[in-house]
């Protein structure tokens, strides 16, 4: 015990009584130092854990009471007092030995160095001693383990989430021997593991209040070791930990520490990880300081578990649609970069939400999808909503009945969906088209009823009705081109018949004739041909008798009008040929004078000058030559009429010339048709 000297007013070191424990502690520098370090680390854990856990703090303090008294009695005197007191020769050894035992080792730069320097044998010795002293209290063993590791593994304090390191850091750096010690002790104290987890978490939170405070690697290692085997310690008490998180909402460092600790339960099991994320991190999504870690944790969780089947059934509509709003709604509490990151994760979240049997679950998502698909929603969100609605309609048959019920109250959203279906009809599976066609037919009837009632939103009703008609037309498919098919068959039949007749020289020897005879159609055909020939002859005789009289009467009625019209047309063309050229020249001169009188900007003058040159060029190069050619053609026609009619151009003469022209045209067409048929038969015979 250190006492005040009466003579000099300084400090002197007084030896304790001769107890075996004290003498052995003085001799064994390594073991005594470790034990005092453990006692010192345990001595500072004076925090209130009355809620939510109950610990055996009284027994824990009683067990280490002797160690604490020994440390207090062996206090090192202040350095200023040492120089005032002459010290005995034996005392310096004792004074220098005590600081070497109690002085806290400085932090290592790297955790790897601290783990290499850790004496695992000394740790095992301390744990054996703790188990022998506190035989019936395994929670004290676990606390000793965490305190010892945290005391020995001191490095500069890191940010709470360890985002720059792998997900299993720092436990991944622990050696196999140390892992065996930790796992063995956790197995022995299996009944106290949950209390031990709470102890580590609350101790970490209390260390964050201290300045500068210790690094928390020892507690982190213990938390990771516990949750690797027992993640349900966290997931069975999510409400308690969420309340703890909300109570520290004003302290981001503590919140991130809690989120990191609870998140360790999900890296070995996707189901437990999703429970943690949905129960702890989704409620705080949107808080500026906590959102980056929440989304980064979800990204890492889904990346570590590419097989999403183990997470089916974890995300329901209650959790899915807030995520949809966070991902796609603009101006929410997430930054654009976090929104983009969440959008990239959204397809996998959809797979988790829809589950193993989407054909029986998607109809529960349809109403919320439809209510959000408004014309004013953002383009990216609209695209995602329409794709999801189409998936619901094509995968789950019950979605169509849900749509029919919601249709009258969601006309604007339904119009967008119908237009999207019309655009993507070719990509819809054929099995789903039939049910969609029935649904669209029902919606069309609803549209007609709404239009008759004249209710509000008639614009949306008209849009929906137009889209329904287009979809029904697409569903029925294009009409077959019957006219083209008939024409093709007719051409093929005529070609085959011509080829058959030409190759066999007669109908009797041809294949067509033999087929007609064998089928009994030839006699019937001959009778039909005879009747047609008789009727045709009668018709010709009737026309021969009546047509001249009708033609003469028609000519007598129409001839005066036609002659008058011909006279006027001839006069008009004569007038135009005499006066049009002079008017065109006059118009050109007046246009040039107009441009000279009007004062315009230089750019406009250049533009008008270019247009003038273009018009003059067009007039001289196109209009005038065309006009002269037309006049020459009319003159030639007039001269030809005078020559053909021998000077007197009458209607009878013109009629005769027109009939000759028609006859010549008909002969030309016959020649062309015969040549084409010859060519077609040649091509068919070559095949």
UniProtKB/Swiss-Prot annotation:
Source taxon at top rank: Eukaryota
Location(s) in or outside the cell: Endoplasmic reticulum membrane
Chief place of localization: endoplasmic reticulum
Membrane topology: Multi-pass membrane protein
Record's keyword terms, sorted: Acetylation, Apoptosis, Endoplasmic reticulum, Glycoprotein, Membrane, Transmembrane, Transmembrane helix
Acetylation among keywords: yes
Subunit structure: Constitutively interacts with CASP4; required for the localization of procaspase 4 to the ER.
Stated family: Belongs to the TMEM214 family.
Record protein name field: Transmembrane protein 214
